[in-house]
Amino acid sequence: MAKKVVGFIKLQIPAGGANPAPPVGPALGQKGVNIMEFCKQFNAKTQSQAGTIIPVVITVFSDKSFTFITKTPPAAVLLIKEAGLQKGSGEPNKNKVGTVSKEQVRKIAELKMPDLNAVDVEGAMQMVMGTARSMGIVVED
């Protein structure tokens, strides 16, 4: 018989940096998941991407076991890395803080394609360009 799903937990954790401290510990503790076991598995799976924030969806079952799926890093994190910035603009409509090229946007869109709800790369690029616009990053042709 299949295990019964008790719930899903969505977190954004730095790759290779999961530890029992908040936010990971309390979120997993509420569902009764073995926190250290998750931390070991997550860190082992993401150690090659160290420093990047990785979204993860943890599926918790009735017997307290779990599985997890890692997603691609958020578009905002990838844009900041491509533009060489510390953070986005506080007033994106007034202050532009950086620029990225269409090629850089295409690269990010292709990387994000599995997680985006887009039919083709052009649609994914539009989503990434919208994120850039909301962060005060100018997209150049």
Swiss-Prot record:
Q: GO CC annotation: what is one?
A: cytosolic large ribosomal subunit
Q: Which GO terms describe its biological process?
A: translation
What Pfam families does UniProt report for this protein, alphabetically? Ribosomal_L11, Ribosomal_L11_N
Keyword entries, A-Z: Methylation, Ribonucleoprotein, Ribosomal protein, RNA-binding, rRNA-binding
This entry's Gene Ontology molecular function terms read: large ribosomal subunit rRNA binding; structural constituent of ribosome
- In which family does this protein belong, per the annotation? Belongs to the universal ribosomal protein uL11 family.
What is the protein name stated in its UniProt record?
A: Large ribosomal subunit protein uL11
Origin organism is Prosthecochloris aestuarii (strain DSM 271 / SK 413)
Which taxonomic lineage does the organism of this UniProt entry have?
A: Bacteria, Pseudomonadati, Chlorobiota, Chlorobiia, Chlorobiales
Gene name, Swiss-Prot/TrEMBL: rplK
